[in-house]
């Protein structure tokens, strides 16, 4: 049966879903101040490569980051992830690149359906509510938005097309009406996460796979198309009514908006396997082009009470909750920026007061009529961020400038620079995304 929503753009009365999409809206793009000079090429830890390397990028960089499954509010682990790709964008733009950025929303999936049933709410209403909250959180944190923010529901037609291609290429098979992808069809399977077979099986079972299902050719074979079940949303397709598997959703959306090969695939480190491994395998077999992504940039996990923040465990701190308690969004952003994106860390209650104190010092420093030369701090912030997104190092550089500016007071020294406060404010805004407010004209 087709999805029951009369407004669903991916659910016509009959036939395959169309590929003309009704675009989901992202959030506002904050203004980026223009800085003197230009940044340098980005070096970053590439999971598939196994080390930090300088990315070989053209004038236009194609970035894809996996988005939320909207059944709960944005927690700080989510915020830390999307802050990472915000920094990637800022560094690339400062280096003179154009960035084409796509992010999906998994707005139909088992956890969403289960939560909607538990709470007695229509799954579409739940998704809309949480997507709206996510947008508000991203806006408050000044996260640079994607050019295309794409829900799975609106992209079902694209996904059906890719699954059909995989069927035609002999890379798919049926198990009791469900379609599975054969990992044997992907020569490079395993080259993203570099796990051994035993590790793959464990990760597959922990992250949405079904390695123990009878009838599968390989326990690691991922689901492409889930046949219609009673009470679940479904869409028509050449292989029967149903809904997409998780991994192929991103493969199809990325191909439609960015092409067969993208430059950077992003997401939390828990997505490296099986999600990014399988998405790459689907895309490479369907497209006949390898690799799917030239680099994989993964963000470390954030813990609370000794465990990774997890919706299933419930040990979460939400952005919206911090905002409701009166936290300055810029302080929340600073609390996240003080951690390197590749290092797992623990959220504590002390994080916000420390970030608020830092924010106050920076705002006081840029409010002075003059300050130390801006050129060293601008160069250092650029260098730190271009070197594997070293946000803690960039913050330390601004700390040093602010301390020197405040120590000098109103700038009576002959070495003081009238332009420094405004330029440092713009540096922090453009590269770190932290709003320090306007710098008052001299003499006010």
From Swiss-Prot:
The keyword Nucleus does not apply. L-cysteinyl-5'-AMP binds at residues 66-69, 81, 104-106, 246, 268-270, 302. Binds 1 zinc ion per subunit. CDD domains: CysRS_core. Its EC number is 6.3.1.13. Zn(2+) binds at residues 66, 250, 275. Keywords: ATP-binding, Ligase, Metal-binding, Nucleotide-binding, Zinc. One of its GO terms (molecular function) is cysteine-tRNA ligase activity. It is an enzyme of class 6 (ligase). SUPFAM superfamilies: Nucleotidylyl transferase. Its cofactor is Zn(2+). It comes from the Bacteria. One of its GO terms (cellular component) is cytosol. It catalyses: 1D-myo-inositol 2-amino-2-deoxy-alpha-D-glucopyranoside + L-cysteine + ATP = 1D-myo-inositol 2-(L-cysteinylamino)-2-deoxy-alpha-D-glucopyranoside + AMP + diphosphate + H(+). A motif ('ERGGDP' region) lies at residues 206-211. It holds the Pfam family tRNA-synt_1e. The keyword Protease does not apply. GO terms for biological process: cysteinyl-tRNA aminoacylation; mycothiol biosynthetic process. InterPro entries: Cys-tRNA/MSH_ligase, Mycothiol_ligase_MshC, Rossmann-like_a/b/a_fold, tRNA-synt_1_cat_dom. A motif ('KMSKS' region) lies at residues 308-312. Belongs to the class-I aminoacyl-tRNA synthetase family. MshC subfamily. Catalyzes the ATP-dependent condensation of GlcN-Ins and L-cysteine to form L-Cys-GlcN-Ins. NCBIfam families: mycothiol_MshC. HAMAP family: MshC. Monomer. This is L-cysteine:1D-myo-inositol 2-amino-2-deoxy-alpha-D-glucopyranoside ligase. The gene is mshC.
């Amino acid at each position: 049966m087709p999805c029951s929503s009369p407004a669903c753009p991916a659910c016509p009365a009959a036939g395959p879903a169309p590929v003309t999409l009704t675009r989901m809206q992202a959030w506002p793009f904050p203004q980026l101040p223009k800085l003197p000079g230009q940044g340098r090429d980005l070096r970053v830890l590439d999971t598939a490569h196994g080390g930090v390397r300088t990315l070989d990028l053209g004038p236009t960089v194609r970035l894809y980051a996996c988005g939320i499954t909207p059944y709960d509010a944005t927690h700080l682990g989510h915020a830390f992830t999307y802050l990472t790709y915000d920094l990637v964008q800022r560094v690339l733009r400062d280096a003179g690149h154009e960035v084409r950025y796509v992010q999906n929303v998994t707005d139909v999936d088992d956890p969403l359906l289960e939560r909607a049933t538990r709470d007695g709410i229509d799954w579409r209403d739940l998704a809309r509510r949480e997507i709206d909250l996510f947008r508000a959180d991203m806006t408050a944190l000044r996260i640079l938005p994607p050019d295309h923010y794409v829900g799975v529901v609106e992209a079902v037609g694209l996904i059906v097309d890719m699954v059909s291609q995989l069927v035609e290429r002999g890379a798919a098979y049926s198990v009791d009406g469900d379609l599975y992808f054969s990992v044997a069809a992907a020569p490079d399977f395993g080259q993203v996460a570099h796990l051994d077979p035993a590790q793959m099986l464990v990760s597959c079972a922990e992250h949405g796979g079904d390695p123990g299902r009878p009838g599968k050719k390989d326990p690691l074979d991922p689901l492409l198309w889930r046949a219609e079940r009673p009470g679940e949303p479904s869409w028509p397709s050449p292989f029967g009514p149903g809904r997409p598997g998780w991994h192929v959703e991103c493969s199809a959306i990325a191909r439609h908006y960015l092409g067969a090969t993208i430059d950077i695939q992003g997401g939390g480190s828990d997505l490296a396997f099986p999600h990014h491994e399988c998405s790459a395998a689907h895309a490479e077999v369907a497209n006949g082009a390898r690799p799917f992504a030239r680099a994989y940039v993964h963000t470390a996990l954030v813990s609370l009470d000794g465990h990774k923040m997890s919706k299933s465990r419930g040990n979460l701190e939400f952005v919206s909750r911090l905002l409701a308690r009166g936290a300055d969004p810029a302080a929340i952003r600073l609390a996240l920026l003080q951690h390197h994106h590749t290092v797992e860390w623990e959220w504590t209650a002390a994080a916000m007061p420390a970030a608020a104190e830092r924010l106050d010092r920076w705002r006081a420093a840029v409010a002075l009529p003059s300050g130390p030369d801006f050129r060293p701090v601008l160069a250092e912030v650029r260098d730190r961020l271009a070197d594997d997104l070293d946000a803690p190092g960039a913050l330390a550089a601004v700390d040093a400038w602010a301390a020197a500016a405040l120590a000098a007071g109103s700038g009576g020294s002959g070495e003081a620079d009238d332009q420094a406060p405004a330029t440092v404010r713009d540096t922090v805004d453009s590269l770190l995304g932290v709003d320090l407010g306007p710098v008052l004209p001299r003499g006010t």
